[in-house]
A protein has these predicted regions:
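Surface-exposed loop/interface segments of Gram-negative outer-membrane beta-barrel transport/assembly proteins
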Residues: 1, 39-137, 153-167
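Residues embedded in well-ordered regular secondary structure
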Residues: 1-44, 82-83, 122-126, 143-145
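Membrane-embedded beta-strand positions in outer-membrane beta-barrel channels/transporters
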Residues: 14-16, 52-54, 137-139, 143
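Residue-level signature of outer-membrane beta-barrel architecture
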Residues: 21-23, 57-61, 142-144, 148, ...
Length: 167
């Protein structure tokens, strides 16, 4: 089956660490993580890596409570340029060569019956999209207890992101 030619076993790793604590009026949490996913597609080193960091702190003094949250994520990924790799592989007739590659000419054979695509050729030689993305999320909130059962709360937040794509 042609899917065996374009798919492979891939490793996924995910690591996280966090520290939390506090006292009578203040609590905190800090966490960091790393994620690495190799691609299941044959070809160059497709995959995704992500680093993330998060911190929360809350403090209370008399009738006032303040909370600050900050998170950051950096991601690198490399993907195939063909969005129909699996669909094109499933369209290849079974009577075609098992491996759609001619070692004599060094060329990939085309499936001219249903599509002019060769999924393996596109994965190995068709180029790639490379992404570098950064995300920041920040929130600050303040809460004042006016009377029993009535609180006033204000929230200020920002989402900042920078997405970069290269081919």
């Amino acid at each position: 089956f042609y899917m065996d030619e374009i798919l492979r076993t891939a490793m996924q790793q995910n690591y996280n660490v966090s520290v939390s604590g506090g006292g009578a009026n203040t609590t905190y949490m800090i966490s960091a993580g790393y994620y690495d996913q190799e691609s299941n597609f044959e070809g160059p080193d497709y995959g995704r890596q992500r680093y993330n960091f998060r911190t929360n702190i809350t403090t209370e003094y008399k009738r006032v409570k303040v909370t600050a949250l900050l998170s950051y994520s950096h991601e690198n990924s490399k993907t195939t340029t063909d969005g129909s790799t699996i669909a094109n592989a499933m369209r290849i007739p079974t009577y075609y060569y098992y491996r759609q590659y001619d070692p004599v000419t060094g060329k990939y054979l085309l499936n001219d019956k249903l599509t002019d695509r060769n999924s393996l050729g596109l994965l190995e030689e068709g180029g790639y999209n490379k992404y570098r993305n950064d995300y920041v999320n920040a929130n600050l909130s303040a809460e004042v207890k006016i009377i029993d059962g009535l609180k006033l709360r204000g929230v200020l937040g920002a989402d900042i992101f920078a997405d970069h794509r290269y081919t």
